[in-house]
Every structure is written in C-alpha cells, then in structure tokens.
Amino acid sequence: MSNQLPVNYTTQETRTAIENAAAAGAGDYKCLVCIFLFGASDSHNMVVPYGNGNPNRSLYETARAYGVRLGDKNVTNQFSNELDSMTLNGAGGPGTSPGGGAVAYEWALHPSLTRLRSDWYDGDLAIVRDVGVLNRPTTKELYNTNPNDLYRPDRLFAHNIQQLAWQKALPFRSPESTGWFGRTTNLLDEFFNPDMRVSSGCISVSGANPQTFAYSPKINVVYPATVIPEGKSRSYINFTTTRDNFYHKNSPDASPVGYPPLPKNNVMNAFSRIFRNSVDSQAAVNSNGGGWDENDGGVGTQLEAIFDNAYTEIINTTLDTPDPNDVNGSNSRTLPNSYFINTMKNIAKVIYSRGDVSGVGFNQRRQLIFSGVGGWDNHNNLRYFHDPNLKTLDICIKALRDAVKLMGLENNVTIFTETDFGRTFRSNGTYGTDHAWSGHSFVVGGAVKGGMYGPEPDYILGGDKDVSNLGRFIPNYSIEQYYGTLLKWFDIPDAQIPLVLPAIDLFTPTNIGFME
C-alpha cells in the first residue's frame, strides 16, 4: 500500500489549473468544517414527514412506535405541538424553500433544532436527503443479485468500516489510506497556502482522524497538541516559547533536543513529525493571543462570551422526552457532550488564527477542519438519548456560526455533517433503531443555497428503495456527489475534483447545487 503522492497531482496541467484558481480569488478565504456524528445519527427523526399531505407521514407513524416517533399526542397533550412549530415551509408554502431547493410536501425539523430552523428561514440551511456510501449507482435488484460485487459496499452496516468509507471517499476496495480532506490539501496547499506555518491545510480538533490523512510528505495536524514526551508533565510544553527546544524547527527530520536520534522512515520519526506539526498548530494559535484576547473588551471578549454562554446553556438545559412505557409520562434528561462546545471553540480559534498577522497565525487561505462527537448509536430508547444530543448539536453549531459572523466570515465558512450511515425507518423492540444505509445531511453557512435537495424519499417498507423490510434505503446521492459540491465551492476546478474523489464520475450530477 503506497502513500506516495500520485504523479497526476503534479502534472503541469494540474498545477496550472490550481494556480489559476488561486490567482482568480487572490486574497480570499474559505473554510470547510466537518462535524462527524459518530455512531450513526437517526436522520429520520432529524427531518420528519409532517402533515396529512405528506404520504410519508402515515408510513412514519406506522413504522415507528410511540416513544420513538415525533408528533404524537399523548393523553395530556404534552407533546402535541412539538412539530407544529418546526415546519419547513418556504415563503410560498411547501412547494418552495428559502434557497430554491425543492420541497414537494411538508416536512419538519426535530424540535431540538430550533436554531437550525432559523438558519432554514434565513436560507442558510441545506438538507441533502438520502446520502450514503455507494460503489456505483445501485438498484434493489442489482443489490440483491450481486451480493459480492460492486453494488454492495463492504460491510455496509459496520460502524468502523463505514466511518472509514465516509472519511476516505475512495473507490471500492481501494488499498489507500488517505482521506478526502487530506487529498484536498495535497492538491491546494502549494498555491492557496504556500507560506503556512504547519504542514497541512487540514486540521483535526478531535484527535488524529483518517479524513485528514494526506499523501506523503504532508503530515497530519491535530489541534490542540495533547501528546507530551514520556516522563514530562503537561506543563513541559509552553507552545509559544519551547517548541524550538523540543525539536529543531528548521530541520524537518531532526530528533527532539536531548533525545536519541530517530532513524528515518520509522514509526517514531513519523510520530515526531506529526507531533511537531501539532505543536506548530498550537503555537500559531497561541501567537495570536491564544486564539483571541478574552480581556480586550472588544471582539476577543465577545467571542469568549459566545462560547461561555453556550456552555452555560448546555449544562443548564433539561429536556422532557416521552416515556414509551407510559403515554402519560416523560423522561427528563440533561444535555450530554458539554465538552463539544469546547471543540467548537477550538475550531473558532483555528479560524481566527487563519491569517498572517506580524508573522503569527497559520497563513492559510483554505482550511479544512475535522471535528466529531459520539453518542449517536441509539439502539435503545432513541428519544431519551437522541433528543438531547440534537439540542447540544444545535447549540454548538449556533455558537460557531455566531463566532464566524463576528469575525466577518459568515459567507466564508461552511459547516456540514457526516455520520456512519442512516438508521432503520422501522423502530426495533427496544424503542430504538438499528443500522441502515442512507440518511439526511445538514449543510450550514452564508454561502449555502438553503432548501431540500434530492427527490421525495420513498419510505415504503420492502419497497423499491428498501433492501430489507426494515427501512434500509438505498442512497439517492453518493458521498462523492455530496463532497464534490463542497469542493466545487472550494474552487477546485471540475477536471481536478476526481483527484480528490476518484469515483465521482460514476455518478450524475457531480454537483448537487446546494452551494453558491
């Protein structure tokens, strides 16, 4: 398995195309922020068929038990209005949406997603329906008659394999280990980020992740750097003053000062280089006042307050979810994953430190930032866990968007979701849902053309789109089509997008159209 940069990344044709793209937008800035929902979020409860006019509403009510589905009236009417205030009609009714995407019938967002619903009405939220891993365009017949062939992704319902499939976006059974963020930075950095102070234009704020793995010689960058040399305390690293004492900055393959030399091309040398780049990322932020000066009485103070207030809201919020064993009762739950707001804050710090101010910062025109949060594998008591997870996600996205707006970058930063796979449309016997295939994804930002994308779903159990009788639906869009639309906005020319997404030309269209 080779991790060497392919020759077609460095041909004169490719280099000229990327150089011209960089020159055309000289001085501009764009950032893609991925939020990976580890465990597979149930998107059928994120975006819900609503109203008698939507033929999928009756299918939804039949397939999902009380305590799993949304929009029920219990005896006390406690939950009767939970969808009434969350409809996604456009200005002209269900036939339109704010950004022009098609909405043939009424739909609603989960009641935990009030802030994202505001983004919808601002035209800043795209809902891309039925996205998933596809080897090539697939029908139920092809899936059933070719069980060991190209129409069935490897270990389709396995978390780890499908997470890698989303993060790598490589052709069927490719031996490579790179991720699509990493390959993007291989393609763009020379001309969009030529003087940056870390090895790569993509950074993970959630630990080392395959999505950011690039071809050699690019090295993964993790922020904040959290790995400490053996025998040293956490306080050993003062990132703004001691990084040159930890390694020889100007000698990429040098060993840390005071440590034995490291032979080239071994695991420890690779680890040292990854750590050095992560330390550099920390230094780039710290050189910019730790991201910002929270005591400056201006923008820094306001940015700090955004995340402090969001954290306070998360830890002080409780939700009442239906008790599936008692139609009169509810379960009260505090919001989990309060740490995720700190992840959003770290993303904001990386974005804030994007530029070159008196020799500090990342000096990047194109940034790709990976983040992730777990807790979405809800086989049991879905609403007790899923509802507060969605509320946390809603608060976190709003905080990051508020910070980006304060920086004047509302149209420059696009946030999008990924997850392992969809969940079964039919609930199971423990008031949860199981592993499935396609699901719905969110894209949020000032450059997003808000609305619904993709045809009306076919939610008939055992129907033409269901490869089981449980509601495991074939994706309408491949992940390549989803990512390709984002890369087009990122100014990668059409002819070069297959370098990042080698299988994209198997699918039509290659641009779904949800970005300006």
Language model features with spans:
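Histidine-centered active-site microenvironments of extracellular/periplasmic hydrolases
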Residues: 419-452
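Active-site lining segments that contact anionic ligands and/or coordinate catalytic metals
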Residues: 366-368, 410-412, 418, 436-439, ...
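Metal-dependent active-site segment of extracytoplasmic phospho-/sulfohydrolases and closely related
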Residues: 397, 403-429
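Proline-centered loop/turn at the N-terminus of a beta-strand
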Residues: 124-126, 414, 440
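Feature for exported/extracytoplasmic and membrane-associated proteins, marking the mature portion
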Residues: 1-395, 399-406, 446-516
